[in-house]
Amino acid sequence: MGVEYLACGNIMSDRIQSEDGSYSEWNMGGPAFYALSGMRIWTPQVKLVCKTGADYADSYGRWMDDNGVTRESVRVELEEHTRYTLRYNRDGSFTPTPHFSMEHLGYLKTHADDIDEAAAGCRIKGMYMAHNCDAV
């Protein structure tokens, strides 16, 4: 049986900076990865469609391999995937610090052609798409 569901969009990792200056481990995330994880609970016929950095392989790639998810439509375009450090304040608010430029984020967006290529030859039943609007 082939792929039936696509999770399209970005993946990103976060780490927490505590008040004492210490850092948590990097935590996998991003809307497309969360969607993929949820889909995978119900079926192995899922595929992640995204552009990312080569370092994704050590965490996201390993998770995908361990959970029987193909890496076929993950396009490595840069050295590092999107990452943020979140510094939490006593009131529960936080300040995100990106480890990339906005050009980086725009460059890694999933486009319609990426989705068409990922869906070719598949009988797609559903798709999740995470994509923010660009300013015009």
Model-derived segments and their meaning:
Residues 1-18:
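Positively charged, low-complexity intrinsically disordered leader regions
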Residues 3-7, 28-32, 108-113:
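Short, composition-biased local secondary-structure segments
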Residues 7, 127-130:
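Redox-cofactor binding/interface segments in oxidoreductases and associated redox assembly factors
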Residues 13-21, 25-26, 43-128:
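Conserved N-terminal subdomain of the carbohydrate kinase-like
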Residues 21-37:
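Short catalytic helix/loop segments, enriched in acidic residues and glycine
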Residues 40:
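Gly/Ala-rich phosphate-binding loop of Rossmann-like dinucleotide-binding domains
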Residues 132-136:
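Short acidic/polar capping segments at secondary-structure boundaries
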